[in-house]
Design a protein with these regions (language model features):
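Bacterial N-terminal signal peptides that target proteins for export
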Residues: 2-16
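Cleavable N-terminal signal peptides
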Residues: 17-18, 28
Length: 286
């Protein structure tokens, strides 16, 4: 991707502001379904006219519905299952310390689909590329899609829930894994706070690093952002800091981070598509 310009930065700042308002008015249940749809729905609202027209031309369904397609084809295309994540290991500080697997991963799959969408290939291939891009940008903003292979991205790290917290979250299970917490339970809790009229305090670290977060512009950068979140003791993923019980205090502390990741996913997805379709339009000019 091209280096950021001041116009790019201002554009993304505007998108983040609008995206925040959009997210606060959205119902939120699970990143693997509802959150993917919301990320793409909000990204679509941020597209320019050229990009919106191209999305409508390529797709045979709404953009938000298109963004869950990649999960729905796992059973018929099992070779794509590894494309939804990138494995790391304890002690890793940057995705550059890992090796892309031969079977593919979220970063290499996204890069491939970006190339396809930006090409003059068949409409069907470009349609699927667009659906993959919408989904993978979301996956690469969920920290536990760039987590340890040894515990399947937090799927084998379990926490128990109190009956009170089960009721707040509308969760029947008495025991959940860390991946599920970040896939959807934190978002449910954020909606609970909003419905209760409580404000969600922004993390000071997020405020302090807002400009640097926005300037990180490649899928590898997004992965490094996730790794930084996972390496934060407050996330509770590092072995010395893991807890046996999911608490309301944890959800309250982590909700601003999870929601910020979703807003960034929408904003970056919109910027990416605006750039891709603008480049194609320019190339097609006589």
């Amino acid at each position: 991707m091209a280096a950021l310009t001041s116009d790019y930065f201002r554009s993304l700042m505007q998108m983040l502001f609008i995206g925040c308002a959009l997210f606060m008015s959205c119902d939120s249940k699970a990143w693997w379904d509802t959150e993917h749809k919301r990320i793409c729905e909000n990204a679509y609202a941020l597209l320019n006219a050229t990009a919106k027209a191209e999305v409508l031309r390529l797709l045979d369904r709404s953009f938000d519905d298109a963004c869950v397609w990649a999960d729905n084809v796992k059973s018929t295309r099992p070779q794509t299952r590894p494309w939804h994540y990138r494995n790391t290991f304890p002690g890793v500080e940057s995705i550059s310390q890992t090796v892309a697997p031969d079977e593919g991963d979220a970063i290499t799959a996204l890069q491939k689909q970006i190339a396809i969408l930006g090409s003059d290939g068949p409409k069907k291939e470009r349609r699927e590329a667009l659906m993959w891009i919408g989904h993978l940008v979301g996956d690469l903003h969920q920290p536990f899609h760039v987590a340890y292979a040894e515990d399947l991205g937090g799927n084998r790290v379990y926490l128990s829930l109190s009956s009170d917290l089960q009721q707040i979250l509308g969760e029947r299970r008495e025991r959940v894994n860390m991946h599920a917490v970040w896939d959807g339970l934190i978002s449910r809790y954020a909606r609970h706070l909003e419905a209760s009229g409580e404000s969600m305090a922004m993390s000071p670290d997020l405020d302090a690093n807002k400009q640097s977060l926005i300037e990180l512009k490649t899928p590898a950068d997004w992965a490094d952002e996730n790794i930084a979140i996972l390496n934060d003791p407050a996330t509770g993923y590092l072995r010395p800091y893991r807890q046996a019980v999911l608490t309301e205090a944890y959800l309250r502390e982590q909700a601003p981070i999870a929601m910020a990741r979703q807003r960034l996913a929408s904003s970056r997805l919109a910027l990416l598509l605006n750039q891709l379709f603008a480049n194609r339009e320019g190339e097609q000019q006589p």
